[in-house]
Amino acid sequence: DTGKDWGEKLWTFHRDIAERLKQEHPGKKLLLSPYTVTIEPPKTFDTFPDNVIISHVDANFEETTKWCKWRKLHTGEYGIWIHNWIANQTSRYTPQRTPLFIEKQVKFFQEYGVRGIFRDGLGEVYGLEGPTYYVFGRMFDDPANLTARELVFEFCDSAFGPDAGASMRRFYDALYHSIELYALYLN
């Protein structure tokens, strides 16, 4: 009995849909997004069918309390809803994330089986965050072996040429060093 718990009612309904989908359309997946009344994991059952992908909102690059609750319930695939470049985090005219933040984030996603990403906020500061956007795209090629440092070198040498690349790396190093605390912990 779910009583007046609308989140639980929705989770039970979605679990039933997933079970029916699995029977009627084997191999198909159902993406569920914990949000508002369903932000907490269900209480009346302890697992979802293996055709469910949970699209999580509360994970950047560390195991938050909510993330840990979900990992106990769902060991399957995940989607992630990220807020890396949403304008309400800060001024849309200043950089918000750094290559190091992205490296940690992508490695976290790889470790926990994230298969899809929804970006809330597009990123609009190409001149100042160009290396960060580049690292975000390239890290997925080989998260286990690539590093933000080597990708920033690659970006600067490709975008500015080998002569100006060294100067631009110094510029970006100083810029990202000044916002690293915000990017990693105060977001």
Which positions does each model-derived feature cover?
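Substrate-binding groove of N-acetylhexosamine-processing glycoside hydrolases
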Residues: 2-187
